[in-house]
Design a protein with these regions (language model features):
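Helical hinge/lid and interdomain linker segments adjacent to catalytic or ligand-binding clefts
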Residues: 2-4, 8-100
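Extracytoplasmic/secreted proteins, especially bacterial periplasmic and envelope-associated proteins
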Residues: 19, 23-26, 75, 79, ...
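Extracellular ligand-binding/catalytic regions of CAZymes and related secreted enzymes
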Residues: 23-26, 188-196, 202-277
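Catalytic beta-strand/loop cores that center a nucleophilic Ser/Cys/Thr
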Residues: 121-206
Length: 277
């Protein structure tokens, strides 16, 4: 498995994409009930074809979809497209499901829509606006209980930023027939609506995609249900059998992966503009 860490400028304790990538690698390579899985973390799109060809799935973590934030995005997207055509899996975690207006065509078209099944449409997009907002208590519930990714975790409530009003395509924003909504949450609390917060796709090329819009806060990797949900999705995307009770891992020591901070450190308030004389 290939874990690709993109750039991030979020405050300490939020996103923590490098630490998050290392944590995912440690969990995947030390699964108690699915031993022998190999994973590599990279901090740029790998130029070596051999690295790309060896991957059964590629996991992205970063502030928006990383390939659109790095130079030569056209080339790297084409190389990722080659991986997808051979049936490689793809996973995007939290903001890595995001695309900016400059990344997509005016109608919202982008290959990620088909590779992953849906995406977070940034407010700069002309065609659609998803919503990013922190909720103190978002309850995440299963929407497809029979799916392997749903094995072994229960409904949970989390203080996080599960994106809502995610984009699933031009058909009145209905997911395509090969897309399964895996989990929903009734958000926002003042006008609750069942929002898709995780989904997967089984593509015509034989590959699989999994998108989940959490975790925003690094400390939420401690949540066993959320962690199992994510790791199940990664395993499934690589066409491995998800164990009956979901994958099992030891509780991770979050400090071990060298985040800027485990706890969220809000940015200092911006200085107020001086009143004109």
């Amino acid at each position: 498995m290939l874990i690709v860490v993109g750039p991030s400028k979020h405050p300490p304790g939020s996103h923590e994409v490098a630490a998050g990538g290392r944590l995912v690698q440690a969990c995947i390579t030390n699964l108690i009930n699915l031993p022998g899985v190999k994973a590599q973390v990279v901090y740029e799109w790998p130029p070596e074809k051999s690295v790309r060809e060896a991957a059964s799935t590629v996991v992205f973590i970063g502030d928006t979809f990383p390939l659109n934030r790095w130079p030569d995005s056209k080339k790297s997207l084409a190389e990722l497209g080659d991986m997808m055509q051979r049936g490689c899996g793809i996973v995007c975690l939290h903001y890595a499901v995001g695309l900016l207006g400059e990344d997509v065509k005016p109608d919202g078209e982008h290959p990620l829509l088909h590779w992953l099944g849906g995406y977070f449409a940034h407010q700069t997009c002309a065609h659609f606006h998803s919503v990013a907002r922190i909720f103190s208590a978002a309850t995440i519930v299963s929407a497809a209980p029979a799916h392997p990714i749903l094995r072994g975790w229960r409904e949970f409530t989390v203080n996080d930023e599960p994106y809502i009003n995610n984009y699933f395509g031009p058909n009145n924003n209905q997911p395509a027939s090969n897309v399964t909504v895996l989990a929903t949450s009734l958000l926002p609390p003042e006008a609750p609506k069942r929002e898709a917060v995780a989904w997967c796709v089984e593509r015509p090329d034989g590959g699989r995609g999994f998108g989940i819009v959490m975790p925003h806060f690094y400390k939420n990797w401690r949540n066993e249900d959320l962690r199992r949900f994510i790791l199940n999705g990664i395993v499934w995307s690589a066409k491995l059998e998800v164990p009956a009770g979901g994958v099992k891992t030891a509780p991770p020591d979050l400090e071990q992966f060298k985040p800027a901070s485990v706890e969220y450190v809000p940015p200092p308030p911006k200085p107020k503009a001086k009143a004109a004389n």
